[in-house]
Regions:
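Bacterial N-terminal signal peptides
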Residues: 7-16
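The right-handed parallel beta-helix/beta-solenoid scaffold, focusing on the short coil/turn
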Residues: 22, 47, 54, 60, ...
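Right-handed parallel beta-helix/beta-spiral solenoid domain characteristic of secreted/periplasmic
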Residues: 22-34, 48, 68-112
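Extracellular beta-strand/beta-solenoid scaffold signature
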Residues: 33-37, 59, 83-93, 109-116, ...
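Short, T/G/N/S-enriched strand-turn elements that build extracellular solenoid repeat scaffolds
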Residues: 36-42, 57-66, 71, 116-119, ...
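Right-handed parallel beta-helix
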Residues: 74-77, 98-109, 121-134, 151-164, ...
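Acidic, glycine- and Ser/Thr-rich low-complexity intrinsically disordered tracts
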Residues: 295-403
């Protein structure tokens, strides 16, 4: 027995100890492509890849598939990953691992998406900038910040401009926070698509075609979007002409749309400031096209428009019969537009008393606006007992903002 007792601590000493986290530093300059990708490959869980100040000229996309790695630059205006000469058409930076933190650097002019994270749970984007420096163009990449198929997404203090689909896009994901960010001169500023438990707050969304979009679309592996809270955002002057490539779903977004909710269940929109969104400050609609996916519900359900501050909206609607509509409503359309479509037996929309609205009074989903019969909005008031719960990224992600 004594021999066994002595052997146990000796055996423990012989076992390999976990390696301590290390820092891999990469400077800008010659061979940055090779040195940066090598660091991302050699990184181990818990490591930090530190990017120095300067411009990293990259000709191919880079990727990370190691869990719990932090990639940190010297600042979104100081460390720049420059993909202007990118040879392939993929994303600039691709992440496929869990627990990753991306912070304090910029991505410029990728041929495809800026940063795409797929199946990457508990990811943090902090003080990241993605820019297409030539301004709005259909040839720009589709998405700036693009997490998809993930649980636990925190996007904080990022800036995106020039995306030909959405600046900040979160798709087929759960437990999401998008906050304190700037989305400017994209087709859609912020888009939450086929996702649940999302919090979109304190963002500045301006000069896009449409400001904040909450969509649910058919034909995707994950559907049933909802439980989304959109609050305390500044949604201003979303007046950029639509520059999405033909065929994209956002190519149908009308210039001058502030907040658009389509085919979601349980969306609460309140305490936002909407100014100079000339088609509609707030729009709630069913899916606009035909579909053959039996799993899909095309109608908005349980959407609540609470108290929002709205000014100078609906003054130049990009809608058929705009002149007649403006005349009927005294020169500007009311702040809330509903297409009038609802799932039988369900409440599509509730609106705060005193916030005027109007309905297209459509009678059939997917048939366009030809049968519209506009009239005043007549819907119930908000039910405060049904306030949303369980929205936002996990609290554990917050600690990674302040290491």
């Amino acid at each position: 027995m004594k021999h066994y007792l002595l052997a146990a601590p000796l055996l423990a000493l012989a076992l390999p100890l976990p390696a301590s986290a290390k820092t891999l530093t990469v400077a800008a300059g010659p061979d940055a492509q090779t040195r940066l990708q090598e660091a991302l490959i050699l990184a181990e869980p818990g490591d930090e890849v530190v990017l120095g100040a300067g411009r990293f000229v990259l000709i191919d996309g880079i990727s990370l598939d190691v869990d719990r790695v932090t990639v940190r630059g010297a600042g979104m205006d100081t460390t720049v990953l420059d993909f202007t000469g990118q040879r392939d058409a993929g994303e600039g930076f691709r992440v496929t691992s869990d627990g990753v933190t991306l912070r304090d650097f910029a991505v410029e002019n990728p041929k495809g998406d800026g940063i795409k994270s797929k199946g990457a749970d508990d990811i943090v984007y902090h003080r990241i900038r993605v820019t297409w420096t030539n301004g709005p163009a259909a040839t720009n990449g589709a998405y700036g910040i693009y997490p998809v198929e993930s649980t636990g997404v925190l996007i904080d203090a990022v800036t995106v401009s020039g995306a030909s689909d959405a600046g900040i896009y979160v798709g087929q994901s759960r437990a999401i926070t998008v906050r304190n960010s700037v989305a400017e001169a994209n087709v859609a500023g912020i888009e939450i698509e086929n996702s649940r438990d999302a919090l979109v707050e304190r963002n500045f969304v301006t000069r896009n075609t449409g400001g904040i979009l909450v969509f649910d679309l058919p034909g995707l592996p994950v559907m049933g979007g909802g439980n989304v809270l959109v609050r305390d955002n500044l949604v201003v002057a979303n007046t950029t002409p639509n520059f999405a490539p033909p065929g994209n779903i956002v190519a149908g977004v009308r210039r001058g749309t502030g907040i658009l909710v389509m085919a979601n269940d349980g969306v609460w929109v309140e305490h936002n400031t909407l100014y100079d969104n000339p088609t509609a400050p707030i729009m709630v609609v069913a899916y606009t096209q035909g579909f053959d996916d039996a799993r899909y519900n095309p109608y908005p359900r349980n959407v609540t428009i609470g108290a929002n501050r709205v000014d100078r909206g609906g003054t130049d609607p990009q809608l058929d019969g705009a002149a007649q509509l403006l005349a009927a409503f005294g020169g500007a359309l009311p702040p809330v537009l509903w297409d009038g479509l609802a799932q039988p037996g369900a409440t599509a929309l509730r609106v705060e008393p005193g916030l005027a609205g109007w309905s297209l009074n459509l009678t059939e989903q997917g048939k366009g606006l030809g049968e519209a019969n506009p009239g005043p909005l007549n819907v119930p008031t908000p039910d405060r007992t049904a306030m949303l719960t369980g929205v936002g990224a996990p609290a554990a992600l917050e600690a990674r903002l302040h290491p």
